[in-house]
Structures are given as structure tokens and as C-alpha cells.
């Protein structure tokens, strides 16, 4: 009885936060930042690709740092969870094909928020024991002078990503492998937990190396498969694109209220998927060794595009080419059924393997978000060790448990975390605009590789510890 009451209460809070408050706040900030940066996500798309190719730098002792690409891979690892396979399917079932169009829109506009938060994370980063550290908690303390706000954010993100989200990813992996291969959930959970602990106890550089290998392989593999499905159904591509656009704006949908459903589902799933403005990706953006803070802003903007415009679109095409979505199937089952209809029984096996790669990479990416914030709360080594062990325990717990209540609670903490971050980046946004102006000014002067030092912008001189 108590659990039912608690579940209903949490569900009510979620409805208010996600239907009204959070969607309005995220959209409003995304549009504002797009206007203030003059569409940085569109103007500097070519520069994003150039920066992504930069190699790791060397520090004063010659040690290797986290490169732009590795930071991109870790943040993309967290974004590329099972939501890419299940979340898009759910959006299509609930909101119709038109939800895909609104996911595209929110990615294009929301990318500006990702640029601002990651640029600020670079500006306010600090030197850690084995890498740079930073993120929203750090710019809340140093930029706004409000440590309490940083601690609140740090607690929320550590619980949300390290515990709740990782439990869900673990649960999805073990359920998929049990269904596809008959794997015992207990042993699957033990193996998954051991792999997780092995990697996270190696620190950010091991996490970056593993992500730098897994993410390109799984993303490219999934894209190649999706392209194969598209080529096989090339004659139907205009029909599917027309279906997406018509369902987003058609008269039938308008009269039936379906446009509103498509809009809400597309926005909610898009925001949840690409994390723009949530305050998660800046934690890893701060670790990169770059010559100018704007570079990581550009890299993380590209991450939003890769996540939604590429990976999520692949899933949408696979499902829509498979026919009318079956509302009786859940997200993962729908994607699996759609693939099986295209390539036969091998599709189910591919989904099981893809789920493992997507979800496992997400687990280690999510963990690092928590690590950066545990270090903000306290520098004591035992606290980080305890957190790592608790993350491992939650991965094992997730493999064996049902997680409906935990997932609903995570939605609440994630919403509060996001609102906290949005308030901070709106207040500090002008500093990101100044950095962008400095970067583009250097490019106009013919400088191929812009460099930032704190004396270039007097207003930021006391803010930049590492510049």
C-alpha cells in the first residue's frame, strides 16, 4: 500500500515536471542560446569536425591527457544507452511517427545549450590527480559563488546516473541476453559487475580508452546496419519521410490532438536522449586537454547531433520500414521485431549484442559523471572507493530486480538536476558568449588553432584556474 502511494505521488510529480516545467525551461534556454550565439551549432559545423580530429596533448611531464575525441567518446557512451533502441520506439508508439520530426527539431535547437554548458565546464575546470576535473558543480561554486548549489547538483547527478540509470542499463542487458541466449541472469549480472568494476577502478583515462574503442565500433556497426535496411527499402524512403512530416503537421492529427502527443513525445524523448542542457556531458567535457574552452563546446554540440540526428534516426527508420508499430510491444521488443522482419532471426541476436555494447558503454560513462561530482563533494580517496563499490552493487542489483519505482524516482532527480544546471548556465551564459567571440576573432585573423589564456578576456581573469 505504501509503495503504491509513493509510486502514485512520484508519478504525479513527474507529470508536472516533465510535461510543463522542464520542457518549457529546456526549450526556452535552447532558443535563447541559439539566438545569442547566432546559431553556433550551424555556423561552426565544419570546425566541429576539424576539432574532433585533434590528438591528445602532452602535459609538462609528458603524460597523456584526455583528448577531444576521447572526451567526445565518453560523453557519447553515456548518451548511447538503451534509449537509442527502446526510447525512440516508445516515442513512435505513443506519439506516432511525427515524434521523430520533433526529436530532430529539439536536437538542432538544443545543441546550443550543450555548447554553452560544456564551454563553461572547460573554463572552470581544475587540475585533478590524474586529469582535469570539472562540470556544473564546479562552475556553480566558482562562477556563481554558491557551493551549496554545486553540492546539491553533485548529489543529484551521482545518484541519478551512478545508481538509478546504471541499474536500468544492467537490467536491460541481462533481460536481453536471457531472452536471446537463455543466459542465467545471476551469472550475467556477476560478469557485468566484474567488468564494470575492472574499468571504473582504472580511472578516467582507462574509461576514456575503453570508450574510445567501444563507441566507434558500436555506432558505426549500428549505422551500417541501418543504412543496409534503408538501401533495401530505398523505394519506400520518400514514403517514410512523408509519414514523419505529415504526422507532425497533418490536419487529421491536428483535429485529433495527435500533433500535441507527437510534439510532447518528441521533445521529451529527444531531451532525454541527447542530454543537452541537463548538466551531464560537461562533467567529461571538462577533462579534455584543449587549447581553447570553445573546442569542447563544439565537440559536445556534435555529440548531440550524432546522438539524435544519426543514431536515433537509424532506429526510427528501422521501425517505420518494418510497418505500423505494434502498441502491444515495449520499446526493445518493437525494435527487435522490426529488425527481425528485415533481416530474419539474426536481427534478434544483433539487438542483444547491440544492447550490451550500448548499455555497457553507458554504464561506464554514467559512472564517470558521478565520480567527478563525488570528488567535488570531498577529496577523500575512501569516498571515491565507496562510490565505485556502490555503483558495482547497483549494477548487480539492477540485473536481478524490477526497477519501475527506481526509474520514476530517477526521473524526478534528473529533472531537478536539469533545472539546477539551466539556472546556472543562464546566469553564466555571457561568459560562454565572450569565449565564443574570442575564438571566432582568432579564426578570422587566420589563426588555425585558437589559444585561450585568461589575460585575453579581463572579465574572466579571476575565473580561469587552468588557463
Report residues per predicted region.
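Alpha-helical membrane segments and immediately flanking helix-loop junctions
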Residues: 59-93, 120-123, 129-137, 141, ...
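N-terminal alpha-helical transmembrane segments of multi-pass membrane transport
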Residues: 1-82, 93-98, 426-467
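Helix-loop-helix module between adjacent transmembrane segments
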Residues: 29-34, 106-130, 136-137, 141-171, ...
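Extracellular loop-to-transmembrane helix junctions
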Residues: 11-50, 93-130, 306-312, 412-422
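Extracellular/periplasmic helix-exit of transmembrane alpha-helices
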Residues: 115-124, 129, 225-243, 257, ...
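Transmembrane helix-loop junctions in multi-pass membrane proteins
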Residues: 5-6, 36-41, 83-88, 97, ...
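Flexible loop linkers connecting adjacent transmembrane helices
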Residues: 39-67, 90-92, 96-100, 104, ...
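Membrane-interface loop-to-helix entry segments
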Residues: 25-32, 37-49, 171-177, 184-232, ...
Amino acid at each position: 500500500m505504501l509503495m503504491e502511494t509513493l509510486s502514485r505521488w512520484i508519478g504525479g510529480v513527474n507529470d508536472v515536471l516533465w510535461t510543463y516545467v522542464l520542457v518549457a525551461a529546456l526549450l526556452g534556454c535552447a532558443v535563447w542560446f541559439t539566438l545569442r550565439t547566432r546559431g553556433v551549432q550551424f555556423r561552426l559545423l565544419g570546425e566541429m569536425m576539424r576539432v574532433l580530429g585533434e590528438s591528445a596533448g602532452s602535459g609538462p611531464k609528458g603524460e597523456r591527457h584526455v583528448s577531444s575525441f576521447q572526451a567526445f567518446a565518453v560523453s557519447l557512451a553515456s548518451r548511447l544507452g538503451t534509449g537509442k533502441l527502446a526510447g525512440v520506439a516508445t516515442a513512435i508508439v505513443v506519439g506516432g511517427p511525427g515524434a521523430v520530426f520533433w526529436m530532430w527539431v529539439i536536437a538542432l535547437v538544443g545543441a546550443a545549450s550543450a555548447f554553452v554548458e560544456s564551454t563553461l565546464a572547460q573554463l572552470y575546470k581544475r587540475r585533478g590527480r590524474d586529469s582535469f576535473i570539472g562540470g556544473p558543480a564546479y562552475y556553480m561554486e566558482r562562477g556563481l559563488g554558491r557551493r551549496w548549489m554545486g553540492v546539491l547538483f553533485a548529489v543529484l547527478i551521482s545518484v541519478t546516473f551512478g545508481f538509478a540509470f546504471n541499474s536500468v542499463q544492467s537490467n536491460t542487458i541481462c533481460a536481453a541476453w536471457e531472452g536471446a541466449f537463455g543466459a542465467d541472469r545471476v551469472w550475467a549480472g556477476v560478469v557485468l559487475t566484474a567488468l564494470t568494476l575492472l574499468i571504473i577502478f582504472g580511472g578516467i583515462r582507462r574509461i576514456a580508452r575503453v570508450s574510445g574503442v567501444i563507441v566507434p565500433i558500436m555506432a558505426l556497426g549500428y549505422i551500417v546496419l541501418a543504412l543496409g535496411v534503408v538501401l533495401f527499402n530505398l523505394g519506400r524512403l520518400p514514403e517514410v519521410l512523408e509519414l514523419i512530416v505529415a504526422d507532425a503537421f497533418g490536419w487529421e492529427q491536428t483535429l485529433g490532438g495527435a500533433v500535441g502527443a507527437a510534439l510532447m513525445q518528441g521533445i521529451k524523448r529527444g531531451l532525454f536522449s541527447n542530454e543537452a542542457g541537463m548538466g551531464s556531458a560537461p562533467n567529461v567535457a571538462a577533462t579534455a586537454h584543449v587549447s581553447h574552452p570553445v573546442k569542447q563546446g563544439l565537440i559536445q554540440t556534435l555529440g548531440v547531433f550524432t546522438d539524435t540526428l544519426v543514431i536515433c534516426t537509424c532506429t526510427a527508420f528501422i521501425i517505420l520500414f518494418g510497418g505500423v508499430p505494434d502498441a502491444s510491444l515495449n520499446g526493445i521488443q518493437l525494435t527487435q521485431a522490426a529488425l527481425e522482419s528485415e533481416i530474419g532471426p539474426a536481427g534478434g541476436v544483433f539487438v542483444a549484442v547491440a544492447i550490451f555494447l550500448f548499455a555497457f558503454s553507458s554504464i561506464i560513462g554514467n559512472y564517470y559523471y558521478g565520480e567527478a561530482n563525488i570528488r567535488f563533494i570531498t577529496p577523500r580517496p575512501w569516498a571515491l572507493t565507496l562510490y565505485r563499490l556502490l555503483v558495482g552493487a547497483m549494477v548487480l542489483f539492477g540485473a536481478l530486480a524490477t526497477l519501475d519505482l527506481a526509474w520514476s524516482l530517477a526521473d524526478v532527480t534528473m529533472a531537478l538536476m536539469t533545472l539546477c544546471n539551466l539556472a546556472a548556465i543562464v546566469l553564466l551564459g555571457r561568459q560562454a558568449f565572450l569565449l565564443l567571440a574570442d575564438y571566432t576573432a582568432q579564426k578570422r585573423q587566420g589563426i588555425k588553432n585558437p589559444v585561450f589564456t585568461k589575460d585575453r578576456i579581463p572579465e574572466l581573469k579571476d575565473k580561469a584556474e587552468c588557463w
